[in-house]
Amino acid sequence: MSSGEPAAVSIPIHDHHGKAPATSSAVPAAAAAAPAAAPAVAPRKVGIPFFRRGDHHRGSRCLAFLDFILRIAAFGPALAAAISTGTSDETLSVFTEFYQFRARFDDFPAFLFFLVANAIVAGYLVLSLPFSAVLVIRPQTIGLRLLLLVCDMIMAAMLTAAASAAAAIVDLAHNGNLRANWVAICMQFHGFCQRTSGSVVASFLTVVILMFLVILAACSIRKR
């Protein structure tokens, strides 16, 4: 080949009809003419603004809020049990010249312990509400949560002992004990037995809520 002849250009043919493949020279122009895509908009978060702050603390904050609600719920039965026991005194209309038949809660040491324990637990639940509110705001405070856990366990143990002792006396008042020749007194003192029985039920309900509080605190500390 001489230097004056134009160089031959080879075009590859891949199909069976002898046609050259189409060139893609118009593709960049079409891409340039296409409008720019709009920037992606992040989805707006929906929910309570207080619980949206600090997503990494959301679970602990929800547990702390549930702890606060349960403390309010436990305060009612504990206070009701203390008031019902303290006002359970009953005096029969039948009496003699020298003796008057009556039933008083302070005649039974178990009921006296029961009343004091429920009053202490009710007062503790009220005093613990500000600390529980602090944990809702600052869920990362482990020391305060550990303090409430220990106090909740102490209150639950004390109230369980008091409610169990009172339940034994209530059962004795309803059924008596034939072997010991102790007669049931609920046949005569209806109001006394109704109030003390309701107090025991309310107190055990408080114990159940306190156990839930202990479990919640343990789960929160374990997450940390």
UniProtKB/Swiss-Prot annotation:
InterPro entries: CASP/CASPL, CASP_dom, CASPL. Pfam families: CASP_dom (PF04535). It is found in: Cell membrane. Its main location: membrane. Residues 84-110, 167-200 are extracellular. Residues 1-22 are annotated as: Disordered. Regulates membrane-cell wall junctions and localized cell wall deposition. Required for establishment of the Casparian strip membrane domain (CSD) and the subsequent formation of Casparian strips, a cell wall modification of the root endodermis that determines an apoplastic barrier between the intraorganismal apoplasm and the extraorganismal apoplasm and prevents lateral diffusion. Homodimer and heterodimers. This is Casparian strip membrane protein 1.
